[in-house]
Regions:
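Surface loop/turn motifs at the tips and blade-to-blade linkers of beta-strand repeat domains
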Residues: 42-47, 84-89, 134-140, 191-201, ...
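Short, conserved, GDST-rich strand-edge loop motifs in beta-rich repeat architectures
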Residues: 108-117, 157-174, 274-276
Length: 297
């Protein structure tokens, strides 16, 4: 009987050693190859303010600086409206915006102050007058850099930094993406994949926008790239499925919904707003679009 038990144990160990490497290989194989794609340049808009990002609607583009917004005509390039805050004021670091109907929704933070605090600021697109503010206060998530609609709620990105503006006990790897309901109650979220945070360090995502294809498009602080992420079948980390070369210098991006798959970004050095045709991204088998994820049990 003792010999039989020993043989059973030995066979179990041998079987484990044979299966474990195979299981590990299968797990590693679940990560798809990152698609390498190229955006096509479409248009350039000259501004004096585009240092943090840009937004767009059918007829206009919007330049974003720390406490300045400017509205320009697409057709002629004329300045239509401008909103100007004050240095050290309540709105001190506008990170990104997106246009929706008659409103411009913007992510604001107190960067580089500590502790990190954030707010959502809303402006009327006709005159750029400020019409609403939603304070998120101090959040463990980090500093709000971008947000977008997801269903009836919100998808938002929060930054942590290695240097200036960082807490000292959370580095760039703690940058997170969270899902909120329409009242900004947190429903869940994801880590960002290492292959993306490495490209953004020592900063985090400066811009983010959910595509019509249900995938998430992120831009970093300074690289001429946009990273495309999908939701995993299981686990807490988004999957990096594509990197798109884009003629920008990082900073915030937004979709121009007046055309299909047109993204806008900026050249910080020249303060230009630039638009691009973004190629289709193939969703690898076994992954999900963020719009397909169910945040209820």
């Amino acid at each position: 009987m003792k010999l039989t038990k020993a043989l059973v144990t030995l066979l179990a160990l041998l079987r484990f050693n044979l299966v474990a490497p195979q299981a590990q290989a299968e797990s590693e194989a679940e990560l798809p190859a990152v698609q390498q794609l190229q955006a096509v340049d479409l248009a350039v808009y000259q501004t004096g303010e585009a240092r943090q990002g840009a937004a767009a609607d059918t007829q206009h583009v919007y330049a974003i600086d720390n406490f300045t917004l400017a509205k320009y005509e697409k057709a002629g390039g004329s300045l239509v409206a401008r909103w100007q805050g004050i240095r050290g004021g309540a709105i001190s670091h506008l990170n990104s915006c997106f246009a929706e109907k008659t409103q411009l929704f913007c992510a604001n933070s107190n960067f580089p102050e500590l502790p990190m605090a954030s707010s959502v600021e809303v402006f009327a697109t006709d005159s750029l007058r400020h019409i609403h503010s939603l304070s998120l206060g101090i959040m463990d998530e980090g500093s709000l850099t971008w947000f977008d609609r997801l269903g009836e709620g919100w998808l938002a990105g929060f930054a942590h930094y290695d240097g200036q503006g960082g807490t000292g006990f959370k580095d760039h790897r703690f940058a997170t993406i969270y899902r909120y309901d329409q009242s900004w109650r947190r429903l869940g979220g994801w880590m960002m994949p290492d292959s993306v945070t490495r490209q953004m360090q020592p900063y985090a995502a400066s811009g983010g926008a959910l595509g019509a294809d249900g995938l998430l498009y992120l831009s970093g602080h300074d690289k001429p790239e946009v990273y495309v992420l999908a939701a995993p079948r299981m686990g807490p980390k988004l999957i990096h499925v594509a990197t798109i070369s884009v003629n920008i210098e990082g900073q915030a991006i937004a979709w121009d919904d007046s055309a299909e798959r047109v993204l806008i970004g900026i050249s910080r050095s020249s303060r230009e707003i630039r638009s691009f045709q973004i190629p289709p991204v193939v969703l690898p088998a076994g992954l999900f679009r963020l719009t397909e994820v169910n945040f209820t049990l």
